[in-house]
């Protein structure tokens, strides 16, 4: 582990402790022997035959643990000796506490408490002096009152301590005098500083001017994810919440969702109004059994009514289809797929999700996006032999199938309605209700065993003996199990250190008889023979003598599975090309001999051959532990071992995400990996917390003296190799956890009688066992506290264990009196617990100000600035973690009730090393003294070989990433707050740019660290050995978060200023032809120059916001590299699929069009020549759903907002030409706050010049006519009247649709009506119904031939606004429709209006003579007219890729169509009663 220099002075506590240690050593002889925790315990009385046993000196050593381990002389200096300092392990120098020093320790605690109080008073006085020196009285009021209230948080407690601990008026007066002196000195220093600060007065005044600004984070960064089965709240720290506070992302999503609606309308018009020559059933009934009885009682499972809405049937000239795999004779009358209006909803027996494995028919170039019914077109079915499976969902089929036929075994087809004999090259699979996702597959070098027990059905009840017999087949051989356990405790144990190593190994010996191979070897109790007979010795019997052994067996299975997944050879191969060399860190293989490397390679190759299947864990937790019942119903069998298993289970679910679907029944529709963002972990952690409360873990074990009385009975049970009959006088909770520790202590004592159990264990060993049990108790509790903090940080949810010290007095594991000389790695674990808890306190301080509603509603800028500065000092190593926590408490940013007053014996030298020292440890391979001196070669030779040092440094690496992610989040919040204020207050521009640059620096830091991790996981003996599974998701999540900010900056760099609500249009209608040749040539030159610079770009350097035009290209190159990384990681990790889709989504969207338009073809060649309709499997399903599905997407909800169906606003007067319907006239919807116009921090003069040139070229191209809408004048509007909407059709014309209306007047393409004109009178963004449209019931072409003829000649977008059930005659609809300034749809029925029958498409009037089958709507024109977003030209082909296409809602849950945004396609359960009950928010 790397050490960093700390310029910390030796505290007074250490000097007092040192003087205490220097007392006469004769004081030891009168103390109680053994490591007793009580000072008044009786001395040890020897038995009558004690003279025959050699007496041992029961004293506590004075030398430090490290010197005793190295067997060198210790000078006993405090806080660390010189020997440890010279060898570079001063941070591990540890002294066991003396029993006679307990009273002195209490005095030290009092003095330390007084010292902390003095520091707080000093900080308060300093703050008050600054307030009084402020020239503004307003700032005094606004600053003094809230600050004092925060600073004195918990002051009553400290005041009581002061009164209790001083004890005399003289000490209080003395302290008062010291405070006065310190105050005078500080005033003099402040006066001298003020004289030297005149040069920086301007910058300081700007900073001080906005210090008291309040931010309301409860509205800007909160999301509510509405799902089909409930709602989930996502706080400000969730990865989805970043877009809510950014106006650019809001408007971009609004544009994307609006485009998605328009593109669906285009597809609808293309397919709905073509003549259907034939409507044949796609199933060939000729192959069905011609049984008369069957024909009379059974029907075809295809819903033929679907063809009436535009579905094209197979043509007659198509080749003969294959035999239908559906056996129609097996369908009863109740198996027909239900219509939408049927009351009894019986699901279709065909499992459509199975088509993703190769049975999906190829899609047409223009599928019908509004078709939600399942069609089976066997003419286009392509069976993939290696992947084809039975398409029947047996769970839905067996529910409605007759029991007499289901139980029949004579006819194989009676069990499954599929005639498998007709499925060519497809093997029938046995029916199983256990659908699993393939978990991590072994790499090329691994050969997993195929267990027959994996193929058996697990849905039926299994007895305990059957489960144990099955597990014996699944578990690896004994020697392999021992190797896995050793690997776990060597590499993975520091990540979840809640076990007692010796205790756990002893349990495994009892259950699996591992020591029977050779009981005369290492501390595990078994040898590692190379003989093949011993190597392949299987597990023949599993002994479960106690009830808790089932939990120990479950922990073992998790350890076997997790360690196998973490083997470096099993990690994903990452090849980023030339950029890979930039992210490599030095490894430590040079420190190992060739023989050691060879031995390690042999062990890994042996372990790779023995994979423990995930089904073994399912069997254990379901039938042996019955964890579902324990965690939800009863706590009768809850003990420490149960809590340990629950923690391991939670840890495994988060780490091995590909196994998650096998273990849980979570509905993961629309989420790539529910294991990290779903509510399942929240429920499990709450259960773990309640079980910990039930076991009393929140109270320190020293409060329960009855723990000492259970050891003799426990040891007797263990020595007898215990049956399940426990001593009724003992505590069963302790029996299950302390027994093995006692036995292990007996085996280490060297006494044969103790090992055999014939004599009771002596008191010293009992005391050691008690202390180890208490130590495990404390470790479990503080690990739960850390889990709570991490979950709150990941999901943005409130913490469960708030104000920890108000209900818990459990001490840190460092308070345990254990001799670590035999277990140095446990000493490192103890040090890490203290350090990580202090880091968690820093994270808690941030979470309180962001997530707590009482603080987040009015958090002030200077509070966030203080958090930023302290976190920067911590991660850059300029301040020790103890000092950072003390500063947080003194400044009122962290209440003492959160646990700020940690134990007084914290090691100031054991802190968080610098990130550079962690990464470069293998290269320099040297440490520094505490005073900064380099170590010599002789000191390096004497350095102690520390266990799992690389794992500890990897954990330090993850802590740095977490802290810097918080710094990025805080800077991003302040940036999005001050950037829109620049147009009104220019002084905020400096602040906004500073915060943006800081946010970008920390985002790039997280991006680099993510790349460093994945580029080094497969290196031998690297920093991340065996940590590839545990740290993969945290690192990838931080990299994904940083890319979100990259998207924000690219939008600003490409779009320029937002035009706001009172100027020109936000979303313009420029096309590709709007660019003149000179501007495009200049763009090409700039792009070529930027590409040359990118070739020399160093990904390890920070990006400057002043990079100008190359900023977007630099950031885009990083997005492309991250997309390449996630694509490779998707092969192994499911959660990488979501991130790959997210990155690919924005890469496709933000790419600049690379092809110039052809003026001869009218711009139609703007599309790529080889463009084809993208495959449905590549679409983003959250954009392919219908409107009801999108309303459940949190991004959609926050980008557009919820409103009533008619889009009426509460309190707004009815405008001319607008009619209000029903209750919407009195019931308003939720509207988003208005967005003000402002210039982004990336705005430069070159952006202005290029935008002006673009605007001029666009103005030259336009042709004005009577239908043109002047954006600068709301009065120049054609006259018209408002048609009466009917059947839910809003009278408000949707945004982005007027271009198709204006195409009716001569084919010209004017600009889109200004968003300002639509919303200026309402003061808000356009509502949901103004941007999207309700689904329209279009007329049947067979009913009205004349109407169909007119529709054929309309543009595809125009016909989207015609309603079949309207009461207005079609002749009255043949008028000019436009949008006025109020957003009202107007119809001109004057004589000058042109009729629909005479309208032409943009391609000319010659299309009117074409037939319906020959006419094809012009998709390219449509895309070009909608590819401009605020000056950002979006590639039309990319636009189709990200918003086009249509996914069947039944396929949204497939693995290959997983989305990066959550969306559901089922109604919200429990809210059906509120439908249309004046609750527009649920509409």
Swiss-Prot record:
BP GO terms, sorted: DNA-templated transcription
Coiled coil: 105-134
Residues given in the record as Zn(2+) 2 binding sites: 64, 81, 84, 93
Cysteine disulfide links: none
Subunit structure: Binds DNA as a homodimer. Interacts with SRO9 and YDJ1. In the absence of heme, binds to at least four cellular proteins, including YDJ1 and SRO9, forming a high-molecular-weight complex (HMC) which results in repression of its activity and dictates its DNA-binding specificity.
Stored PANTHER family: HEME-RESPONSIVE ZINC FINGER TRANSCRIPTION FACTOR HAP1
Free-text function comment from the UniProt entry: Regulation of oxygen dependent gene expression. It modulates the expression of Iso-1 (CYP1) and Iso-2 (CYP3) cytochrome c. In response to heme, promotes transcription of genes encoding functions required for respiration, controlling oxidative damage and repression of anaerobic genes. Binds to the sequence 5'-CGGNNNTNNCGG-3'.
Protein name (database record): Heme-responsive zinc finger transcription factor HAP1
Species this chain originates from: Saccharomyces cerevisiae (strain JAY291)
Gene designation per UniProt: HAP1
